[in-house]
Amino acid sequence: AWITGQGLGWEAKKEEAFLRSGTQFSGAEGLALPQDGLYYLYCHVGYRGRAPPPGGDPLDRSVTLLSRLYRAGGAYGPGTPELLLEGAETVTPVLDPSRRHEYGPLWYTSVGFGGLVQLRRGERVYVNISHPDMVDYRRGKTFFGAVMVG
């Protein structure tokens, strides 16, 4: 994954990314599955950020990071995508009590989830992320996929 001007981009041919058995990938439309079946869908998104400057209500520093996996197209038809799986994590960064930094220390977390979903040929699955500017796009930190299990 990498940051683009319009959000998060996904890689389909580099590093550990691969496609098999007729699966197709389009950055704009997601992962197109080649046949009807039961699929294990998974998503793992690494996030990182920096705590805000000291002062104010601690709850104002909290941020809820959402990662959602949707289905669209194929036999499902055009129209509103359907939410299949969702993961969330609320982060309340700890301020640096020594105030050595203008901003607080860096924080890291991840949101991972997976589940079994019955999908049909031509349906596409894609990920929507609430805070693309906080995604950790370094190698192995952010990925999603589908494995046909039945």
From Swiss-Prot:
Membrane association type: Single-pass type II membrane protein
Signal peptide per UniProt: none
Hydrolase listed as a keyword: no
SUPFAM superfamilies: TNF-like
Keywords assigned by UniProt, alphabetized: Cytokine, Glycoprotein, Membrane
Major localization class: membrane
CDD domains, per database record: TNF
Domain THD: 1-149
GO terms classed as biological process: cell surface receptor signaling pathway; immune response; positive regulation of canonical NF-kappaB signal transduction; positive regulation of extrinsic apoptotic signaling pathway; positive regulation of interleukin-12 production
The keyword Glycoprotein appears for this protein: yes
A GO-annotated cellular component: membrane
GO MF term set: cytokine activity; tumor necrosis factor receptor binding
Taxonomy, superkingdom: Eukaryota
Glycosylation sites: N128
Listed SMART domains: TNF
InterPro entries xrefs: TNF (IPR006053), TNF_C (IPR002961), TNF_CS (IPR021184), TNF_dom (IPR006052), Tumour_necrosis_fac-like_dom (IPR008983)
Places the protein is found: Membrane
Subunit structure of this chain's protein: Heterotrimer of either two LTB and one LTA subunits or (less prevalent) two LTA and one LTB subunits.
Job description of the protein: Cytokine that binds to LTBR/TNFRSF3. May play a specific role in immune response regulation. Provides the membrane anchor for the attachment of the heterotrimeric complex to the cell surface.
Family: Belongs to the tumor necrosis factor family.
Name of the protein: Lymphotoxin-beta
Organism: Sus scrofa
